[in-house]
């Protein structure tokens, strides 16, 4: 990847330069990141340790937890370190690495959410063929395809962004290396890079289309059910996934459909906090609080660890 940049490091300006907010932000980011590690790590352990959870739905959920750890870890540790030390510098290579892993894991999440929607469609709309549709091979293929597509997309984004020259200011008006502030910082012609980023962004719309089509057929199937109890049961199995989908895609759409302005930059930062650190923390809570199987598996683990209680 050819690069003629004179910049060797960037300065991440962060969420705010108000010194009175640095400690509260540090504590908030640290707390959320620790909960993210505990929640997603715990979810993977629970699913791995209970044979009853070795199903396609929980296979994708364990991968989702891994991905949430990945893209949260691409951003949160550096942000916490900068808030703690006051050192806002990040090397050129460090910025490129953060950018690559964040975009990669975020795109993988899109594909995993689409795979989970397809799994729910197969379970609700074709229950008699579910075991032959969602085989171990199909699940592995969908998961592998998600990771390959995600990091291929990240490679295209990184190539389109870091081939540019950064020969002026090195101050990124953000708390991590994201696409819009980096393109705004470049002193090169960014039209081709913006086009590449736009085309590569088709991943988000493709996965959203798969999700919408899957849930369209799920809704039709629910409407055809004569039993209110059956409708309630089907809806409850999809409720957690729908909640996670709404939060994730709602935040992305809100961010990238805003007009460019000084106010939208600050709004983008707040939205970025939500989808970089808050959503990875919320996902294990969303999928476990209303899930009897996960809660049952958790109690089994706790009973083994602390039988006296």
UniProtKB/Swiss-Prot annotation:
Domain of life per record: Eukaryota
GO MF annotation list: G protein-coupled receptor activity; odorant binding; olfactory receptor activity
Subcellular location: Cell membrane
Bilayer topology annotation: Multi-pass membrane protein
Entry's Gene Ontology BP terms: G protein-coupled receptor signaling pathway; sensory perception of smell
Cytoplasmic side: 48-55, 117-137, 221-235, 292-309
Cystines in this chain: 95-177
Transmembrane regions listed in the UniProt entry: 27-47, 56-76, 96-116, 138-158, 200-220, 236-256, 271-291
Residues annotated as glycosylated: 3, 260
UniProt-listed InterPro entries: GPCR_Rhodpsn, GPCR_Rhodpsn_7TM, Olfact_rcpt
Family: Belongs to the G-protein coupled receptor 1 family.
Name used for this protein in its record: Olfactory receptor 5B21
């Amino acid at each position: 990847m050819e690069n003629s940049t004179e910049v060797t490091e960037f300065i991440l300006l962060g969420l705010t330069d108000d010194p009175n907010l640095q400690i509260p932000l540090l504590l908030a980011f640290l707390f959320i990141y620790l909960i993210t590690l505990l929640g997603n790590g715990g979810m993977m352990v629970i699913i791995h340790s209970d044979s009853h959870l070795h199903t396609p739905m929980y296979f994708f959920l364990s991968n989702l937890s891994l991905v949430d750890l990945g893209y949260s870890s691409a951003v949160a540790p550096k942000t916490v370190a900068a808030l703690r030390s006051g050192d806002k510098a990040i090397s050129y290579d460090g910025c490129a690495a953060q950018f690559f892993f964040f975009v990669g894991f975020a795109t993988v999440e899109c594909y995993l959410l689409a795979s989970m929607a397809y799994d729910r469609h197969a379970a609700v709309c074709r229950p008699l063929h579910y075991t032959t549709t969602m085989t171990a091979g199909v699940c592995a293929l969908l998961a592998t395809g998600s990771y390959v597509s995600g990091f291929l997309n990240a490679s295209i984004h990184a190539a389109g962004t870091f081939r540019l020259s950064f020969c002026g200011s090195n101050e990124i008006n953000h708390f991590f290396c994201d696409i819009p502030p980096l393109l705004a910082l470049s002193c090169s012609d960014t039209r081709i890079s913006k086009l590449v980023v736009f085309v590569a962004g088709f991943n988000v719309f493709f996965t959203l289309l798969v999700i919408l089509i899957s849930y369209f057929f799920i809704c039709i199937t629910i409407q055809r059910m004569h039993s209110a109890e059956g409708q309630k049961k089907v809806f409850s199995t999809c409720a957690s996934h729908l909640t996670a989908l709404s939060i994730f895609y709602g935040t992305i759409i809100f961010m990238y459909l805003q007009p460019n302005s000084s106010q939208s930059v600050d709004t983008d930062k707040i939205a970025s906090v939500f989808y970089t650190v808050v959503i990875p923390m919320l996902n294990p809570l969303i999928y476990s609080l209303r899930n009897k199987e996960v809660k049952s598996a958790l109690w089994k683990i706790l009973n083994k660890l602390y039988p006296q209680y």
